[in-house]
């Protein structure tokens, strides 16, 4: 999925929009930020504010903003667009929300309730944070070996370690807890300091100002990894 996201972020241009200009489009993002985000770094690319402004300008030039309440009628209209954002990251409130208000645009935000108010960290974000800390050690061989032992996998080199680690399934939560302990990272304190996700108050403020929120599953765990009962 990360590869698909990276491709989508790279190909935004008037040339590509020309190919789909006679239909509604729903560009989607996760985050807009100008600095490095450890919880995102190893997952996918993301755009800065300047590029996001350019995207809005490009879309507004070729399309008409689609009000959310008119989305059911969208199939009958041409050249409309509606922005969507996944995962409920904090930058939705601190960066994206002000820009959309400035431009007079609406949007839909799909969130995972388990992470609202920074109660805990999303599994894939935990993996990226851990890799970022391991990177600080210049991928020390001793640390890599300990992590591989805890998570029960073997690797050839630094590259294969990263690939395997990022593909660990969410059932490995307990092992990932141990890696946090190994690296001496207090996850609760990290969340309190970084505040990776939206709060209920921020969501309410945005809703009061005409923005829409939808569900993106409770915890974003891959459904194919869950039993029918867990789903």
For the regions a language model picked out, list residue spans one by one.
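Catalytic alpha-helical scaffold of carbohydrate-active enzymes acting on polysaccharides/glycoconjugates
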Residues: 1-231
